[in-house]
Amino acid sequence: MTIQWFPGHMAKARREVTEKLKLIDIVFELTDARIPMSSRNPMIEEILQNKPKIMLLNKADKADPRVTKEWQAHFEQQGVRSLAINSVDGQGLNQIITTSKEILKEKFDRMKAKGVKPRAIRALIIGIPNVGKSTLINRLAKKNIAKTGDRPGITTSQQWVKVGKEMELLDTPGILWPKFEDEKVGLRLAVTGAIKDSIINLQDVAVYGLRFLEENYPERLKKRYDLTDIPEDTAELFDAIGTKRGCLMSGGFINYDKTTEIIIRDIRTEKFGPLTFEKPES
């Protein structure tokens, strides 16, 4: 599954981010805790150069907490601080300013020693579409400043947002890479809703989701669809789920489109519980 989705405003955002970097003290790279690596844009490291950074693992409530800890240990080994957060209910957000101050202490001490007047921390928030940037900004600013929604690509321009007196945030449109070289990256992004359903083959996504559940959370899969065992053949598994869910057409044939829709919706709405679709070693 080769997916190419790089709207013009994203190319423009990349140029503007590069220009604004000199104003920035620290970068918040927002990722989806369910797919911490697949939801990172490979271009971001190249764009950000050596700016101090915090990895924000958003939607942590939807991710397997055990695997989230593995990811945090992985980033720590790379010398990168990370925080597991939930921008919807505010979990972990109070640590963002505190951690930023710790990371930037030396820089601000040097500025103070040179007689530079104290100012707010300037942070850049960056991430792929639909990872929750606008919701996070609204939470931090305690205002409904940024447009939010479940459709990828809602923010289309950059804006500075004040977070109390201690921080100023520069929001950017979601920057997605031009194409996904690794098919599994595309599937992980699709199954979590990071890219538009209209540009992907949803049946491929449902098959990926089912096989992932079979390998990693088989009991949850069986329980959800009341299966005594999981058929090895994908078509048989679809048939079993379609039958259990009443997705039948005239003549008793399975409605695969409806079955696909149910499987993807069940995954995205946590009917299988919190899931993480990749581990650090993968």
From Swiss-Prot:
CC terms in the record's Gene Ontology section: cytoplasm
Coiled coil segments of this chain: none
GO molecular function: GTP binding; GTPase activity; RNA binding
Any single biological process term in GO: ribosome biogenesis
Record InterPro entries: G_CP_dom, GTP-bd, GTP-bd_ortho_bundle_sf, GTP-bd_ribosome_bgen, GTPase_MTG1, P-loop_NTPase
Broad class of the protein's primary localization: cytoplasm
Organism domain of life: Bacteria
Subcellular location: Cytoplasm
Domain CP-type G: 14-178
Keyword vocabulary terms for this entry: Cytoplasm, GTP-binding, Hydrolase, Nucleotide-binding, Ribosome biogenesis, RNA-binding
Ion transport in keyword set: no
UniProt-annotated binding residues for GTP: 58-61, 86-87, 130-135, 174
Family membership: Belongs to the TRAFAC class YlqF/YawG GTPase family. MTG1 subfamily.
Assembly with partners or alone: Interacts with ctc. Interacts with the immature 50S ribosome subunit. 2 molecules of rbgA bind to one 50S subunit.
Function recorded in the entry: Essential protein that is required for a late step of 50S ribosomal subunit assembly. Has GTPase activity that is stimulated by interaction with the immature 50S ribosome subunit. Binds to the 23S rRNA. Required for the association of ribosomal proteins rplP and rpmA with the large subunit.
Name of this chain's protein: Ribosome biogenesis GTPase A
Organism: Bacillus pumilus (strain SAFR-032)
